[in-house]
Each structure stands twice: as C-alpha cells, then as structure tokens.
Regions:
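Short, surface-exposed basic-aromatic patches at helix termini and helix-loop junctions that form
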Residues: 76-84, 106
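Predominant activation on well-ordered alpha-helical scaffold segments within soluble catalytic domains
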Residues: 51, 231, 266-270
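Short amphipathic alpha-helical "interface-anchor" segments enriched in bulky aromatics
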Residues: 220, 224-258
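A short, flexible helix-boundary coil/loop motif
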Residues: 247-317
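Phosphate- and divalent-cation-binding pockets in alpha/beta enzyme and binding domains
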Residues: 74-75, 96
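An anionic, glycine-rich sequence signature occurring as long contiguous blocks
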Residues: 91-92, 96-230, 235
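Conserved, well-structured functional cores that handle cations and Mg-NTP chemistry
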Residues: 1-74, 82, 287
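Short hydrophobic alpha-helical runs that function as membrane-insertion/retention elements
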Residues: 85-90
Length: 317
C-alpha cells in the first residue's frame, strides 16, 4: 500500500498566501487501485492526516510505504501496532537516524575492504546488496541498495524504534541521456559521470532531493528483508506518481479543475472512474476492444456494472 499526498492546484482560493488544497491517497501497488482518500485539512500537512488514513485501513499483512514525511516514531509505530509491515525512507529530516544508517554502512564497507572473505563468511545471512540499471528516453538510472539485519549493529536505532529489523542504504545515480550530432548515444557510464560529470550536467549534485543527480537515502523496516526486496518496495512506491497522480492530471485534468467547495467529492468521483477503468484493464488483460465492449454494455444496462466493476474486487484480496 502506497500513501502519498497530491495537490489540487487549480482549486486554490484566490487569496494572497493561500496554499493549494491537498488530498492524501492510498493505492494498492499490485493492482494500481485507489483504496482510500482523505482531504488534508487547511493549516495542517500530511503528517497529521496520515494517522487518520491508517486508522480506516486494514493493513494486516500489507507493507505500507510513505515518503520521508512518514519517518516519525508515531507513524511507524502505528503501522506496527496495526499488524502491518513497512519500508520507510529516512532522509536528512531525521538527522540522527539518517547519520546512524550512514555510519553503519560506512563501517561495513571498511570491514569488507579490509578482509572480504571473513566479512562474507560472518555476514552471509545478514548482509545483502542489489543493483540495477534502467534506461529510458531522458536518462539512465543506476540504483544500488545495501541491507543489513544485524540486531547489535542497529542497536542505537532500536533504542528509539525497537521494532526495526532491517536497515538499508540506497544510492541512485541519474545520468541525462546525451547524443552526438549523428544521433549516437554518448551518455557517459556511471564511473565517468561520478568523476567528471557530463556535458549536460558538468557538476552532479548529491543529496536526498529529487533534483539531485546522486540521491542517497536510508531505509528502515520492521520486517527482515533483503536488499532486493527493499529496492522493489522503494521502486514500487513511485507507482502512485506514475500510475495514479499523473493519470489524474493528464487524463482527468484534476490539476486544472477550479471547483473549490466540491473538490473533495469530485476527487472521489474521478477516482471511482479511474478504478472502473483499472478493474476492466485487469480483467481484460489490457485488451482495448474488450474495454470498449464493456463500456457499451454498461451504457445500455447499468446493472452490468455490478458484474464488471464491483463483483471482481474481492478476488484481488
């Protein structure tokens, strides 16, 4: 379950210093279905709304991911008490925990470099690494995750968060794609980019912000996981941006809707329509002709909506 907030920018009241209203969404990453939403009250933020959203969800046996704003003891403990698992990003907004994670993995790197064989033997079941490379039209992304599950090593973190079982360090390098005059790909490799940058990005920045080319974050979980599993959960967290928020703005024009008093109701209606389409896509295995036939059937007889929209929902759970 992925939880993230989304702004309704066009619904902002035309008053000086008035902030855009926000909706907090919860999405099932396996099916891309929206399972809950609550409006974020004015003069508050996601941090106060997240516990209210968690309260109405049954997260038993589910893994809940939230961006860095969910890295508070209260929100992590609530997920633990509701019998859910979590993979939580830790950024510099939690300086003590962030630095402790960095210290743990810097120490592990020193041990590994000093005596690789002994390190591998002693940490076979506790330490894992995972790396991947993804290419798209705009950039090449290298991702590396290291995970450690040694109780003694993470004892300082467990003093405050006793339910933590795994800690991880993630490094993501984003390199802008480049082509020469003939259209050939001349994007530098990871090592070259880290040493001297590139033509488009001569001085790569490092940090935990989306604008940084080199992003480093920590992660913690109340479940014993491998580096590959944590990397997958971290990657899946972005599905809510790509599969839900982008679709709401581009296809449903949510970001251009100026309705104010009815904005929350309209948001529910948009997500109901979104879920209808997602359910039909799942059932049809993305067969476009099938989707058109179903829409025609529902138009002629709305009771058909029960068969295609509501009856299949329990089968996913």
């Amino acid at each position: 379950i992925v939880i993230d907030g989304k702004a309704l920018r066009a619904a902002t009241e035309k008053i000086k210093d008035k902030k855009a209203p926000y909706i907090l969404n919860a999405m099932d990453a396996a099916t891309n279905l929206v399972i809950a939403q609550i409006p974020i009250p004015e003069k508050t933020n996601e941090m106060t709304a997240i516990p209210k959203l968690l309260e109405i969800l049954d997260i038993t046996g589910s893994t809940v991911t939230i961006d860095a704003i969910g890295a508070t003891e209260t929100i992590m403990r609530m997920r633990e008490e509701k019998k859910g698992d979590f993979v939580q990003q830790i950024k510099k907004n939690c300086p003590a925990t962030y630095q402790e994670i960095q210290n743990i993995f810097e120490g592990l790197e020193e041990e590994k470099a000093a005596d690789p064989k002994t390190f591998a033997k002693e940490n076979t079941e506790r330490y894992s690494e995972y790396s991947s490379c993804e290419r798209n039209r705009e950039r090449v992304e290298y991702r590396e995750v290291k995970c450690y599950t040694n109780d003694y090593a993470i004892r300082k973190i467990r003093e405050e968060l006793p339910f933590i079982c795994s800690v991880a360090s993630s490094c993501q390098v984003r390199i802008p794609r480049e082509k020469d005059a003939d259209g050939n790909d001349v994007t530098p490799d990871k090592e070259t980019f880290l040493k001297q940058g590139s033509r488009k990005c001569p001085k790569p920045t490092e940090g935990d912000k989306l604008t940084d080319q080199i992003q480093k974050v920590g992660l913690v979980s109340n479940h014993t996981l491998t580096a590959e599993e944590i990397a997958r959960y971290k990657r899946d967290h972005w599905r809510i941006e790509n599969c839900l928020h982008h679709v709401l703005d581009e296809d449903f024009l949510e970001d251009k809707c100026t309705a104010r008093k009815s904005r929350n109701v309209l948001s529910v209606l948009r997500k109901t329509a979104y879920n209808i389409i997602r359910l039909m896509q799942i059932d049809a295995r993305e067969d476009r002709e099938f989707v058109i036939d179903v829409i025609d059937e529902i138009t002629e007889d709305f009771s058909a909506a029960l068969k295609w929209i509501f009856d299949p929902i329990p089968s996913f759970y």
